[in-house]
UniProtKB/Swiss-Prot annotation:
Broad class of where this protein is predominantly found: virion
Active site feature: 149 (proton donor/acceptor), 409 (nucleophile)
GO biological process: one example: carbohydrate metabolic process
GO cellular component, as recorded: host cell plasma membrane; membrane; virion membrane
Ranges in the topological domain labelled Virion surface: 32-466
Function field: Catalyzes the removal of terminal sialic acid residues from viral and cellular glycoconjugates. Cleaves off the terminal sialic acids on the glycosylated HA during virus budding to facilitate virus release. Additionally helps virus spread through the circulation by further removing sialic acids from the cell surface. These cleavages prevent self-aggregation and ensure the efficient spread of the progeny virus from cell to cell. Otherwise, infection would be limited to one round of replication.
The protein's name in its UniProt record: Neuraminidase
Annotated control of activity: Inhibited by the neuraminidase inhibitors zanamivir (Relenza) and oseltamivir (Tamiflu). These drugs interfere with the release of progeny virus from infected cells and are effective against all influenza strains. Resistance to neuraminidase inhibitors is quite rare.
Residues in compartment: Intravirion: 1-8
Intrachain disulfide bonds: 87-420, 122-127, 182-229, 231-236, 277-291, 279-289, 318-337, 424-447
Record-listed substrate binding positions: 116, 150, 275-276, 292, 374
Quaternary structure (record): Homotetramer.
Amino acid sequence: MLPSTIQTLTLFLTSGGVLLSLYVSASLSYLLYSDILLKFSPTEITAPKVPLDCANASNVQAVNRSATKGMTLLLSEPEWTYPRLSCQGSTFQKALLISPHRFGESRGNSAPLIIREPFIACGPKECKHFALTHYAAQPGGYYNGTREDRNKLRHLISVKLGKIPTVENSIFHMAAWSGSACHDGREWTYIGVDGPDSNALIKIKYGEAYTDTYHSYANNILRTQESACNCIGGDCYLMITDGSASGISKCRFLKIREGRIIKEIFPTGRVEHTEECTCGFASNKTIECACRDNSYTAKRPFVKLNVETDTAEIRLMCTETYLDTPRPDDGSITGPCESNGDKGRGGIKGGFVHQRMASKIGRWYSRTMSKTERMGMELYVKYDGDPWTDSDALAPSGVMVSMKEPGWYSFGFEIKDKKCDVPCIGIEMVHDGGKKTWHSAATAIYCLMGSGQLLWDTVTGVDMAL
């Protein structure tokens, strides 16, 4: 039933061959639909047997007042999305390369946009490839400033996954130098941050409408996660942070419903510095995030957010496989799990995605192959356990980008199949032209599929000298 129209619900009641025509208003039909969905099967719902006093109902034409039989309503699937079990597989394989600047000889509307911070988010029917553009294309005359993180020209854009982000293919969602997006099963939520460093502003767009804002709380580069937010039952959770890149930066989570902020969540625990979280569902109850500490440690801050209580806690990952860059030698940090160790200054956003199985859970991570530079990208996995307390090394699972190729930010996302979700990791491969020429990125994508070993790494195929 559509809440925008008045529906006629004809009920054939088997006792005495009674026919009732009920003219149900939009609001009543929607409430009935929602209430039944909460209490019964989403595909076939049997209503309880209750007396129906037709004589006292102003909008019901009574034909026979003896009707008391039950009725069966067939309803469509609920609109909101929920995490499901992952599709079967035991390894990741190379799925897709989006390397826009292989087409850099194109001009005009076919020219590739200059972008950075790409990420992917998926709804029930499509995935979108997002990025932050400098409002410039290659080739072109506006290369100056394309290595800057923040300026007045940057915008959040997207294309359908598999399309090249060119001028003509791209949708410009909003002015932004930091961004996120997610789909709740009904509509897209877009997040953009821009403004001066001392007073930046989060803007929210739901579908085509700009719906809400959130102001800086530490007056020091309010920013978001540069990857997909996460939705369950119509509620979407977004990580934000505000604070020094070389000091304290405490994160928060915003709970957003249909484009409007309905709650702020303040994590407890090890909160000194948390930014650029990559988040996903460990279960229908818990969102987990692997984040970046740019100030104090090469270990990743790891968030557990309970969506039933809307509470979150942060602790450092305990594994001896340190996931940030730069980082010390694996296993070299002594002391308890909360020890920072050395080489904690600086960092990089890391890939993280869940493999939800009936009897166990897999957590897949990515990190650069170089300990000091943004070069190469390797995949790791750990089944079950608790990232807060498990000190064991993560298991290497293959090379996605070799040491000869750039490996910058990485992120996780899930593609929705008909009955299961496909976990994937994306890698930003930056063409670093410095301050004298264009500075942009390709995106490599690896997804869970089949068995065996990860077979092949990715190259961008771009020569900036051409």
